[in-house]
Design a protein with these regions (language model features):
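Gram-negative bacterial Sec-dependent N-terminal signal peptides
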Residues: 1-23
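Hydrophobic helix-coil surface modules that form long, contiguous segments used
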Residues: 63, 161-165, 172-333, 361-362, ...
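Catalytic Zn2+-binding segment of zinc metalloproteases
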Residues: 336-351
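N-terminal, polar/Ser/Thr-rich
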Residues: 4, 23-62, 96, 152-157, ...
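Beta-strand elements of well-folded, non-transmembrane domains
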Residues: 54-56, 67-73, 134-136, 189-191
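Glycine/proline-rich low-complexity spacer/linker segments in large multi-domain proteins
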Residues: 30-40, 122, 129-184, 232-240
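A surface-exposed beta-strand-loop module
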Residues: 84-150, 172-175, 209
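Ligand-binding face of N-terminal immunoglobulin V-set domains in extracellular IgSF glycoproteins
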Residues: 61-84
């Protein structure tokens, strides 16, 4: 994630130029009672099947998740993270298909939900099936909406922002970086909207009511904070580098302003593939532009679906300067470095987040000079 505050900290190590602070809504600092502790170590997830039905107009969504998990120590309860979610059902699916209903206890202060069963659960593999509803917020944490004006009226787009601990606002999950699992996401969306996630769309089926059921491919193992979902009146342009489909996604009508960002991504991906000796592992890498600004961050490195505020990504060719281009290039280099530092290789806990940011900032600085000499950094 590109943050102005973290950039200040990294400056002392790498003497990088600090991105200017930009203003507008983002997540508010958590109160002390909201700061969570680590989850019990008795269970770990291996796969999430997630189904979402967003209602953008009502700022709410319905969700279902079936979590494949491993019970490591016999237990009578399972605790995971959940925030601002209301559960309607919970059951554990045993081998052979038998189900055990669960008693649900939500701790709002600790942002957890505990599911207790009437009999001990032995070590082994199970599935936890949960039905729930949640809130679409207006600040950049969890699943949130952004409203904007168009010549045909006001529109609303949805995006997600999960770092550091807000995946729990969209999916009940083991929302800690050490818990990596695969994800299969499906979403019911208006047929006129584009849906974007970490993986390419595997199928899109028009339903009887005119909406579309969009299913995305299964992700590689990753931490929950790297999951992404966006939906709106978008358009997309693509290019190919080393077998990877690079994409830029914008609000309809703004795609030409993303041309430089796409070209920058082509240069950076080709260079990183060569430098690291480990090719970018996902089939596609989008950069999704969103309206608005934040004083807390400018972009986020979701694996396969980078999120960037428009002010940090889009350029009007008629008025943009060399400095503007260097800023767009710099942010692309930073967030794409995170696809290796942070996404492919992830810290176990948040106290080592500085490693993600430090390595990404180092690569951002190291690979700017060959392409934009004015942007040299001392490293």
């Amino acid at each position: 994630m590109r943050r102005s505050l973290i950039s200040v900290a990294i400056l002392g190590l790498f003497t990088l130029p600090v991105a200017p602070t930009i203003a507008v809504a983002a997540s508010t600092p958590a109160k002390l009672a909201q700061i969570t502790t680590q989850l019990p170590r008795t269970v770990k997830p291996t796969h999430y099947d997630v189904s979402l039905v967003p209602n953008a107009a009502a700022s709410s969504f319905a969700g279902k998740v079936r979590i494949t998990l491993e019970v490591l120590t016999a237990t009578t309860s399972i605790t995971l993270n959940a925030a601002d979610l209301a559960f309607s059902s919970a059951q554990l699916i045993l081998n052979g298909g038998k189900t055990l209903p669960a008693k649900i206890k939500v701790n709002a202060a600790e942002q957890t939900a505990t599911f207790t069963f009437t009999q001990p659960i032995a070590k082994g593999s199970y599935q936890l099936a949960l039905d729930y509803t949640g809130v679409i917020g207006t600040q950049a944490n969890g699943l949130f909406s952004m409203d904007y004006d168009t010549p045909t009226g006001r529109k609303r787009a949805l995006y997600s922002q999960f770092e550091n601990s807000d995946a729990r606002r969209m999916i009940p999950s083991w929302d800690e970086p050490q818990y990596k699992a695969t994800f299969a996401l499906e979403v019911v969306a208006p047929d006129t909207d584009m849906a974007v996630s970490n993986m390419p769309i595997a199928s899109k089926t028009v339903m009887a009511d005119g909406r579309s059921l969009v299913k995305f491919g299964v992700s590689p193992k990753m931490s929950t904070y790297l999951l992404f979902f966006g939906m709106g009146d978008f358009e997309r342009a693509t290019a190919s580098v080393d077998g990877t489909e690079l994409g830029v996604v914008t609000r309809k009508g703004l795609l030409p302003q993303a041309a430089f960002a796409l070209e920058a991504s082509k240069v950076v991906l080709r260079e990183y593939n060569d430098y690291f000796g480990t090719k970018y592992p996902l089939p596609k890498l989008d950069n999704v532009a969103a309206p608005g600004r934040s004083q807390f961050f400018g972009a986020m490195e979701n694996w396969g679906a980078i999120f960037t505020f428009e002010a940090r990504m889009l350029l009007d060719p008629s008025i943009s300067t060399q400095s503007d281009k260097e800023e767009v290039f710099s942010i692309a280099a930073h967030e794409m470095a995170h696809q290796w530092f942070g996404d492919l290789v992830t810290m176990q806990w948040w106290d080592d987040l500085w490693l993600n940011e430090g390595f990404a900032s180092w690569m951002q600085a190291r690979h700017r000079p060959p392409f934009h000499p004015r942007g040299k950094a001392f490293i």
